[in-house]
């Protein structure tokens, strides 16, 4: 299974924000500069992360974005569930004549659940805390 770019960059944005000193705001422009992503794409990602409570956006002169909850409270599996369309096959009878007897959808559903259950074992904090090589690559001190 390959995550969409939307989910990939959503996770990267969260990793960046979690790597910053606690309480430090950043901007969408700063995140896009770090990862080389289009601003429009990142705005959509941050909006969805904000609606889900993972990011807080503050307007105004001293505004910006930051994590909406502690990194230790953000499970990677939950973020993937929020951002990723997890339907792996289109099992509509109008598209596939074996749908009434097919067991593929059930097998794939179990595989996706196993994948997400494993990701639930990791929080954003697990990915960033005391990760000096990451801080260096992100130019975060």
UniProtKB/Swiss-Prot annotation:
Pfam families: Rrf2. Binds 1 [2Fe-2S] cluster per subunit. GO terms for cellular component: cytosol. PROSITE patterns: HTH_RRF2_1, HTH_RRF2_2. Residues 2-129 form the HTH rrf2-type domain. [2Fe-2S] cluster binds at residues 91, 96, 102. Residues 28-51 bind DNA. Its cofactor is [2Fe-2S] cluster. Keywords: 2Fe-2S, DNA-binding, Iron, Iron-sulfur, Metal-binding, Repressor, Transcription, Transcription regulation. GO terms for molecular function: 2 iron, 2 sulfur cluster binding; DNA-binding transcription factor activity; double-stranded DNA binding; iron ion binding. One of its GO terms (biological process) is negative regulation of DNA-templated transcription. PANTHER family: HTH-TYPE TRANSCRIPTIONAL REPRESSOR NSRR, WINGED HELIX-TURN-HELIX TRANSCRIPTIONAL REGULATOR, RRF2 FAMILY. HAMAP family: HTH_type_NsrR. Nitric oxide-sensitive repressor of genes involved in protecting the cell against nitrosative stress. May require iron for activity. This is HTH-type transcriptional repressor NsrR. It comes from Shigella boydii serotype 18 (strain CDC 3083-94 / BS512). The lineage of its organism: Bacteria, Pseudomonadati, Pseudomonadota, Gammaproteobacteria, Enterobacterales.
């Amino acid at each position: 299974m390959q995550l969409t770019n939307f989910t990939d960059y959503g996770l990267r944005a969260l990793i960046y924000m979690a790597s910053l000193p606690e309480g430090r705001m950043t901007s969408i422009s700063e995140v896009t500069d770090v990862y080389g992503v289009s601003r429009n794409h990142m705005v959509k990602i941050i909006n969805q992360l904000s609606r889900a409570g993972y990011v807080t956006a503050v307007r105004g002169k001293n505004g910006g974005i930051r994590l909406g909850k502690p990194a230790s409270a953000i499970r990677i599996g939950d973020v993937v569930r929020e951002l990723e369309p997890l339907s792996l096959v289109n099992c509509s009878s109008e598209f596939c004549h074996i749908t009434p007897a097919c067991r593929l959808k059930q097998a794939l559903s179990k595989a996706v659940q196993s994948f997400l259950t494993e990701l639930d074992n990791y929080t954003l904090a697990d990915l960033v805390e005391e990760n000096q090589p990451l801080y260096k690559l992100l130019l975060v001190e």
